[in-house]
Amino acid sequence: MLPLSISTSPDPASQFPTVPDLPTLTPTPSPTSGTAKMNEFTISNLCPEASDRLSLEVSPSSTGLLEPKSSTVSPAPSCTGYPIFDLTGISKQSSSGVSSTRTSSLEPKSSAVSPAPSSPEASNPNKRPAYSYNALIAMAIQNSPFKALRLSEIYAYISNNFPYYKMENGGWQNSIRHNLSLREEFYKVQTTDGKGSFWAMNTQLGSDVYIGKDCGSLRRKKNGKPRKYSKRSNTVSNPNPIPQIPSFTPSPLLATPFPLFLYISQAYAQNPNLLPMMLQNFQHFNFQNIPALSFPFPFSNSNGNPNSRN
């Protein structure tokens, strides 16, 4: 048996020369660095003229960094003269829809439109409001976006703004319908599809209509001679955001045209090429010699002449 000789190979790392450690370098700030140069510039160096007119004073009170902030913030004065609205009473609503409470709290409310918080209607809902039915109707219509409301929307406005009518029976709704029908200030606007109607105010009255402060009823101004207004009708004669578009129905005159036009239409139906020639001759036609025809036109009459008059 021959003895086995195991030779160990040298370490691979020992084959490379060792690198001496490099000395650590610590950077020393240079007095001529860019930061030091920028710190040397002041406003007086850049613009000597401005230093005479501007005085920059930095104090702890002006910055507010060293003073503790107060827990209560006093409201700032209004610059434009409009009242500052209190936003603390706004209820939080979801971002998906717009809340009517948020919109109404940002806009000033008129005391003639809805009861104020200090009014008897708000403190005592069981007390009847001091407004007549026609005044309540005028409030509802004038506060609508299009100045026209359906009957159910008028009911909803009155019951929401005056809780007294929400607790009452439906007798007051009959009074609302009677005032809409009998008062000259209101008129009905039919919808274009004929499936409903809106109630609007007569715009011919203009600013003559107002709500009396003493009686709470709808009043008119009396300036000299009384003005004459046209009778209220179902048709819309005044400009309105929801106008009534009348449907066009052919009249009997259009259904039975002038005989000459009837002959032209019949000839065109038989031969369209004859129409230019007939129109050319039609320009030289004397309309003054045409006798007045009765209505309806007797196109066919078995008892006599078809052109005879009744």
Swiss-Prot record:
Ranges of the DNA-binding region feature: 128-220
**Basic residues bias located where?**
218-231
The annotated regions of Low complexity compositional bias extend over: 17-35
Quote the disruption phenotype from the UniProt entry: RNAi-mediated knockdown in adults has little or no phenotypic effect on adult or their progeny. However, simultaneous knockdown of forkhead gene fkh-2 in adults causes 8% embryonic lethality, and nearly 80% arrest after hatching as L1 stage larvae.
User: Any stretches that span the bilayer, and where are they?
Assistant: none
Q: Does the keyword Transcription apply?
A: yes
Gene Ontology terms for molecular function: DNA-binding transcription factor activity, RNA polymerase II-specific; RNA polymerase II cis-regulatory region sequence-specific DNA binding
Keyword Phosphoprotein, does the record have it?
no
* Free-text function comment from the UniProt entry: Transcription factor. Plays a role in embryogenesis and later development, perhaps acting redundantly with forkhead protein fkh-2.
Q: What protein am I looking at? A: Forkhead box protein pes-1
Gene field:
pes-1
